[in-house]
């Protein structure tokens, strides 16, 4: 779902709200049913609709980032301390794939940035200078607000077998460095396809 600012709807479905807020559609339904998020039901149907104005009010009240609101684009956070890799990934993901990209150059900054931007996907280098990538993934998995965030391991040192072993232990995919543009985009698409 891509929505540009000029095409932004006045009323959104629970699925659209879920994608913007990076939560499951059932979470949006719970917000609606509890009265936390104001909207209305389609007469004769169980379908719910959320006016854009109410969603913005809700997001501001709960400190949610509004950056996903205008585009509905997939939000990707790159966590890597190698500047050349970050630069290439950022250029590819923003320019070619039209993703919204945030960058964190340390495990510490990854926590702060993830909390603020609530990415759909985190591309996580396993060999950060300040912390092991597994610890960052563990922190993401323990944060209730990031339960739907997909974590993709990146490494040039680990073997294919070691990287595959990470699947199911907090990671949703992996990229072996060096990788090409198609591999990066395909891995992100594969990881997000299950949820969205």
Put a short name on every predicted segment.
Residues 11-16, 37-64:
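Short helix-start
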Residues 135, 158-175, 186:
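Alpha4 helix (beta4-alpha4-beta5 surface) of REC/receiver domains from two-component response regulators
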Residues 179-188:
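C-terminal output helix
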Residues 83-102:
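Two-component/phosphorelay signaling modules centered on CheY-like receiver
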Residues 129, 147, 159:
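The feature encodes the CheY-like receiver
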Residues 106, 132-138:
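Acidic catalytic/metal-coordinating carboxylates
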Residues 103-121:
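Acidic, metal-coordinating helix/loop segments flanking the phosphotransfer/catalytic sites
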